[in-house]
Swiss-Prot record:
Keyword Nucleus: no
One GO location term (cellular component): chloroplast envelope
Any single biological process term in GO: unsaturated fatty acid biosynthetic process
Protein name: Temperature-sensitive sn-2 acyl-lipid omega-3 desaturase (ferredoxin), chloroplastic
GO molecular function: omega-3 fatty acid desaturase activity; sn-2 acyl-lipid omega-3 desaturase (ferredoxin) activity
Species per Swiss-Prot/TrEMBL record: Arabidopsis thaliana
Induction pattern: By low temperature.
Subcellular location, record wording: Plastid, Chloroplast membrane
Function of the molecule: Chloroplast omega-3 fatty acid desaturase introduces the third double bond in the biosynthesis of 16:3 and 18:3 fatty acids, important constituents of plant membranes. It is thought to use ferredoxin as an electron donor and to act on fatty acids esterified to galactolipids, sulfolipids and phosphatidylglycerol.
Amino acid sequence: MASSVLSECGFRPLPRFYPKHTTSFASNPKPTFKFNPPLKPPSSLLNSRYGFYSKTRNWALNVATPLTTLQSPSEEDTERFDPGAPPPFNLADIRAAIPKHCWVKNPWMSMSYVVRDVAIVFGLAAVAAYFNNWLLWPLYWFAQGTMFWALFVLGHDCGHGSFSNDPRLNSVAGHLLHSSILVPYHGWRISHRTHHQNHGHVENDESWHPLPESIYKNLEKTTQMFRFTLPFPMLAYPFYLWNRSPGKQGSHYHPDSDLFLPKEKKDVLTSTACWTAMAALLVCLNFVMGPIQMLKLYGIPYWIFVMWLDFVTYLHHHGHEDKLPWYRGKEWSYLRGGLTTLDRDYGWINNIHHDIGTHVIHHLFPQIPHYHLVEATEAAKPVLGKYYREPKNSGPLPLHLLGSLIKSMKQDHFVSDTGDVVYYEADPKLNGQRT
């Protein structure tokens, strides 16, 4: 079953498997309920629904009736909803609700986004270098760092195969996009595949996964502090590429890393060579243009890009006002793990970074092209029901998410070493260090 689910999503299974949990729902004596919720829920009242896409997009949908539609919950039912309970629908139900054209990949459209973003990157650099004005440099740094992040998202689509159906085109475009911003394409692609295949699993997830309590408490106090004290976590990505997360070993650059299978060594070496070539080019440009000019044109925008990447990816898996579950063992399944992800609204940035905020459907079906994710999300909402958490509307810039980030950094430190359904816990001593 696990192999069929992963192949349906465009994945090649990894050597290690976790059996998918078989669930069923007992009928509730009250006809208004679909299932029996637990007596002691781990979360409080869910956030009221916000119009995430309604103010920015007006989709005219022609959507087939989903196989499973949840009834509008009463107040009592909403209060008792357990996000860790197995859902009353399966992956096929969600897939059936998504229009068929959402699965179609258009390489010309994908390339048009590449041309657009690359043109903007060079245009911004040319304007900044021409005026060379300290009043304009901060605006350039933010804009160019955001565009570097947009390039990363397009390379990310290449890694998933949602860019096109041609693996060679995906590889060439992915290497050009990611190498230009010092990301090893295949090394990251493979580890990101592991992240999607194991999303929501305490031990086997790859990105921003929780630390078990025993590992957390064995960290040095300075490591704990830097891991959860802003802005340091938002600068972590380059260090993660070199040495991964606490509790895991290996490097995205080394072909013998635990991240990779033996047959993937050639791919990793190719990407590391491309990364090295880009680093050498930057060194040469330092001699030609001067280190200060290169710092202004490339160095600072690079770190803005890193902050965007860490900010977005962290909040797609953390920071909801209600605690969301993480799984182990038989309680984990591909569907349940994917339902712990979160959509976010980024205001004006939505279009710039290719609607990466539509993260739930992307995690469940990563081969859907980014330009179909908004429509696919709207179509899937009736099936997902309360397992979909409407994001709060953003202003022009997603400043509202800063509060969610700060709160999560203060509360989400580790999970229990035992239990197959666990929730983040806070370290009161760490919080005490900040007060």
